[in-house]
Amino acid sequence: MKNVCGLDVHKDSIFMCIIKENGDKIEEKFGVLTPELDRLRDLLVYHSVGDIAMESTSIYWIPIWRVLYSDFNIKLVNPYFIKQLPGRKSDVKDAHWIATVLQKELIKGSFIPEPIIQELRLYDRRIFYLNRSLQRAEQNIDLILQRCNIRLSNYVSDIGGKSMQKVIDSIIEGKTDPDILLLLVHKRTRNKHGDEVIKAALTGVISKTDRMMLKLSREETCMYERQIEECYVEMNSICQTHFSQEIELLQTIPGIKKDSAMRIVAEIGVDMKAFITASAIVGWAGLKPRNDESAGKIKGRKTLHGNKFLRVLLVQCAWAACRTKGSRFFYKYQTLTKRMNHNKALLANARKILVIIWNILSKKQPFTTTYIAA
């Protein structure tokens, strides 16, 4: 047995409990400022602590990890899996409980990638939230146009598309004549619905205040788009230096382009030793049906909670792959939709893509794309 340590992490305090091989306990409270973290590290070194465990409390564990990970074997644990016994809830007892289950080897650490992957993750997740904000800003622009009875969004597939942007920019400049706005709409949209219908959709009542609201919202969307592009530039720089081979290999899969490949690497890394089997990474991503069985009856097969960032990204890639005619994903999707709904078929393809990704990164071999003649 080794000397082990359990840390109960809070926003402004850390409760530490060391359990030695002979059963002795050392308990102490620390602050969260860097000098306090250095003092914690020195104390752990002094007592020859080998293994440390702490709960994944918000982002408060990250500074502690950065100070300690180079000197100790640290396990970051999901609080759900190490719940304390009823009636024993206090900060000191929590730290002691974490140390106890660590000493008895009853816990498994979460997947924490190497520092360079963590940097990529910061960009990836920033992109995730920027895309959400961009969608909200575009929806707000459409609400302003609807208030002015400009109904172009009823006839275009993408409210963030070029036709909408050109029309919005023209309205902001004060050009509200429907005949002028009509010329800015893509010919395909005009041919599909007719010039008279599109012209009527562009006829509205627009005030000076409406134009100002459009201008402010348009500047907001431009800011989000610029920041997303900056994040991709930084990610590309890191990937070209460290993961160029893996990025090229991932792009051999239908539905995965360079931007998606970089974001996948940001979430799972390139070393698949952390996931013993493809099934392990599928479960970690939340793409594996759960096993809810009692008395021989299956109660449910809903997918587990997992990495939402990776899951959303893989579903987007799966949708692109399913529309690649001739690919195995296209025919799998067509087959599955005959007996299940669209979303379940997409999720099944997302799982298939993740299994392929695991094999590609494990074997460092490209995906052999087999296209079937239509």
Give residue ranges: language-model regions.
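A detector of single, family-specific signature residues
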Residues: M1-A374
